[in-house]
Each structure stands twice: as structure tokens, then as C-alpha cells.
């Protein structure tokens, strides 16, 4: 399990350049030839240097990173929620994603026309957010009509859902975001099935010129907006990312060193998405394979075992655990055991990021 992030943005903001760089760097998946309706989907490996460090010690036959899926949603335009452009299909495609990566143009280039005729990140963000809010408003109004009938018949769940929808409605009518409303756990659970777009965790991917990472008023504006929303901003230069994606590993390292960059910006995008969804990684490390697994933060040992196979959760007995730092420091399982760093945990154990685990189960 990884996660699915929909990449949205207005036309000509560098969205497809960024997406193509992401998927070139990754594993080719269901890459439909881009047509007007189907989004492009790419699966990318999660960059995690810990995996290589574990493999260095264990020397497995293969190393498997955890992955994420990115979906390139074609350029949204004003009126998309009413079916303008290819609106309806695209909004339906975003609905299927777990998070939204909103690409915002923060660079000037006379050769690349901006749809609104000028660079204005605040307006661009507003255009997209308004379309998402209008699409949610439509879903909300229809839900209210259905729920009112059921609530009249005394349906308790319908009454509860209706009370939430009535809280959400005025916010959407003002083109606001549902994620700005303080909803508790039960309320969020009750409306989960609606897949509201403005409830999805969102990050802004600010597409800048090569020299636009500092002293860039457009980028500053995106940061201001994100801060108000409690959203994350990841600045990247899609043009550089697309060059990096064409290089082999050795050339990549050299190219990054020449630019004075530690790692490709896409790594930051992938990690920010991971964080956005409250995900973390644990590892299994054996001679056959060293592998990374994705779980929600706060998952118990049995729930974490289930991502390998549901039988592991059903027949869970115990988990053998070594913290990542201990595994590295004591050069593997035997060393960690000798140092007293190997332990057995029960079904209530909350798995920590980086735990190296082996599950005992009985089916």
C-alpha cells in the first residue's frame, strides 16, 4: 500500500512536465496513452536511504521500496464543476485520490502562455479551489435532499449525517474548503464515503525557475496562502526535474552536485505527500528481500502485519522488533540481539517509523 495523489493545476503551469519527470523516475504502471478523459497514472518508489543502509548489512537477493501512485488530472479550467473543458470526468478522477498536489506557476516565461494572461498564484489557486468547492457543493446539496427524506423516517444515521451536511453547506456556498471546518472523528467517519474534494489533504507544488527558489514574490504569495490553510508548500523546478529524470544514477549525482542540490525536488514532493497522509514506514529484512511497508502513523502491530498478508493479522502471536538505529548500529539482527536491542511485542504495540520487524503468526 502506498497512496494515490492527484496532480491538479491550470493548463500551462508545468503539471505534465512534473508528472512525466515523476513517472520517468519511477516504475511504469498503467500508463494509458494520454487522451482527453483517462488520467495518466504513474507509480513511483518512495526515496528512503534507510532501505539501502539495511540492504548493505543484510545483503538480500532483492530490495523493494514502498510505492506511491500519482495521477495526472488534465488542466482544470474555470467552469470545470459545470462540465466546462473536460470538467466532470476530471473531477471524478480526483475524487478517487487520497491527496491533492496542486501545481502553481511561480515563474515568468514569455514563451509559455498563462491561461489568464498574467502570473498570479493567488488567482490561480482561487480558480481551482472554487471549482473543487462547487463540485463539493453539488454533492452536498444532493446528499441533503436524500438525507432529509431518510431523517423524516426516523433514520438516526441520516439525522447525524444531515447535521454535518448543514454545517458544511454554508462554507461551500462561499467557495470555502471543508478541511477548514473543525469536524470531529465521528463526523469525518460519517462523511468519508462522499469523497469530498475540499476535505482531501492538499500540498502546493510551486513550480519555479532554476533561480526562483529565493527572492521570488510568487513563491512567497503561495506560502502565505498555504500558511492560512495549514497546507504544505514544496518548491520545485519542473524543467530541472525533467532533465534529472533523463539521466542515469551516476550522471544524476554529478548533475545535482553541479547545481549544489542534495536530492531531486521530486523526492521532496513524494515525502511531503507521505507526511500529508500521516503515513510511515516499517521494514522487513531477510536474506530473500529487504522491503519497506507503508502504514498509517499509530497502527498497531497486527494492523501493520496485515499489509503483508491478512493472515498475519488474523493469526498474530507476537512481533519481533528492532529499532532501525539499533539495527544499523549493531550491524544486523544478531548484533542487536547481543546488545539486548531485540524485543518481542504484543498486539497492542504501536509500530514506530523505521522499526525492523518479523511477525510470528499461526493460521
UniProtKB/Swiss-Prot annotation:
HAMAP family: YchF_OLA1_ATPase. NCBIfam families: redox-regulated ATPase YchF (TIGR00092). One of its GO terms (cellular component) is cytoplasm. Residues 278-361 form the TGS domain. The lineage of its organism: Bacteria, Pseudomonadati, Pseudomonadota, Gammaproteobacteria, Pasteurellales. It comes from the Bacteria. ATP binds at residues 12-17. One of its GO terms (molecular function) is ATP binding. Gene3D superfamilies: 3.10.20.30, P-loop containing nucleotide triphosphate hydrolases, TGS-like domain. CDD domains: TGS_YchF_OLA1 (cd04867), YchF (cd01900). Belongs to the TRAFAC class OBG-HflX-like GTPase superfamily. OBG GTPase family. YchF/OLA1 subfamily. Residues 3-256 form the OBG-type G domain. It holds the Pfam family MMR_HSR1. Mg(2+) binds at residues 16, 36. ATPase that binds to both the 70S ribosome and the 50S ribosomal subunit in a nucleotide-independent manner. Its cofactor is Mg(2+). Keywords: ATP-binding, Magnesium, Metal-binding, Nucleotide-binding. This is Ribosome-binding ATPase YchF.
Amino acid at each position: 500500500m502506498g497512496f494515490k495523489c492527484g496532480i491538479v493545476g491550470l493548463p500551462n503551469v508545468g503539471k505534465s512536465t512534473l508528472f512525466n519527470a515523476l513517472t520517468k523516475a519511477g516504475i511504469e504502471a498503467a500508463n494509458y496513452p494520454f487522451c482527453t478523459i483517462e488520467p495518466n497514472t504513474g507509480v513511483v518508489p518512495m526515496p528512503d536511504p534507510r532501505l539501502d543502509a539495511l540492504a548493505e548489512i543484510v545483503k538480500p537477493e532483492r530490495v523493494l521500496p514502498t510505492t506511491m501512485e500519482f495521477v495526472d488530472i488534465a488542466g482544470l479550467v474555470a467552469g470545470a464543476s459545470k462540465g466546462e473543458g473536460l470538467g466532470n470526468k476530471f473531477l471524478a478522477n480526483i475524487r478517487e485520490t487520497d491527496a491533492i498536489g496542486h501545481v502553481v506557476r511561480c515563474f515568468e516565461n514569455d514563451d509559455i502562455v498563462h491561461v489568464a494572461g498574467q502570473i498570479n498564484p493567488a488567482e490561480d489557486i482561487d480558480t481551482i479551489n472554487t471549482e473543487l468547492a462547487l463540485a463539493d457543493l453539488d454533492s452536498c446539496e444532493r446528499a441533503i435532499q436524500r438525507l432529509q427524506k431518510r431523517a423524516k423516517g426516523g433514520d438516526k444515521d441520516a439525522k447525524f449525517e444531515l447535521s454535518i451536511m448543514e454545517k458544511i453547506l454554508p462554507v461551500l456556498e462561499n467557495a470555502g474548503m471543508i478541511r477548514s471546518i473543525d469536524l470531529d472523528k465521528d463526523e469525518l467517519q460519517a462523511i468519508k464515503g462522499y469523497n469530498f474534494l475540499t476535505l482531501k489533504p492538499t500540498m502546493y507544488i510551486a513550480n519555479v525557475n532554476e533561480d526562483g527558489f529565493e527572492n521570488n514574490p510568487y513563491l512567497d504569495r503561495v506560502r502565505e496562502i498555504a500558511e492560512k490553510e495549514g497546507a504544505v508548500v514544496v518548491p520545485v523546478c519542473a524543467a530541472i526535474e525533467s532533465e534529472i529524470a533523463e539521466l542515469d544514477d551516476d550522471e544524476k549525482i554529478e548533475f545535482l552536485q553541479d547545481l549544489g542540490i542534495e536530492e531531486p525536488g521530486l523526492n521532496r514532493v513524494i515525502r511531503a505527500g507521505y507526511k500529508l497522509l500521516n503515513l510511515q514506514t516499517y521494514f522487513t529484512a531477510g536474506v530473500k528481500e529487504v522491503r519497506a511497508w507503508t502504514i498509517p502513523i499509530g497502527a498497531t502491530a497486527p494492523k501493520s502485519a496485515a499489509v503483508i498478508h491478512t493472515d498475519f493479522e488474523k493469526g498474530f502471536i507476537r512481533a519481533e522488533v528492532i529499532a532501525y538505529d539499533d539495527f544499523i548500529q549493531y550491524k544486523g539482527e544478531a548484533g542487536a540481539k547481543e546488545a539486548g536491542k531485540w524485543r518481542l511485542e504484543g498486539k497492542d504495540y504501536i509500530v514506530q517509523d523505521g522499526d525492523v520487524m518479523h511477525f510470528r503468526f499461526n493460521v
